[in-house]
């Protein structure tokens, strides 16, 4: 009888350790808060550019229930001279629009294709509202996340976003 109990306990321990040793899904790994490091656009000719500069600010948050929120801002976006967000000049507004983006909605992860698809509810660029945008997951570790849009508007090449997990 004791032998059977011991074997049963060993079987449970073995099954439990095998289950915990299985790698987390991409979806489980992506959940959390990530600090934006840089966005890199690679043109068809191989030339690289950084639309938010080389030291941007930003964040992307993925929730367990499939929601996301993202903001990217260039570190050199000038303040509005009037100190009133409603009375900026056309030039100030144009700079802000070119040097920042905010978007939120829901997301899904395709484990086989290693992609994340953003279903955009709203954005500071209203043309994206209602779109589904797919990104490849190029790197996803405990501390780093890189995704790439391989179809940047206007045929400008690909755009990769680099993130580090927030503490």
Which residues does each predicted region cover?
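Positively charged n-region of N-terminal signal peptides that target proteins for export
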Residues: 1-5
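Bacterial N-terminal signal peptides
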Residues: 6-16
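Lipid interaction determinants
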Residues: 17-167
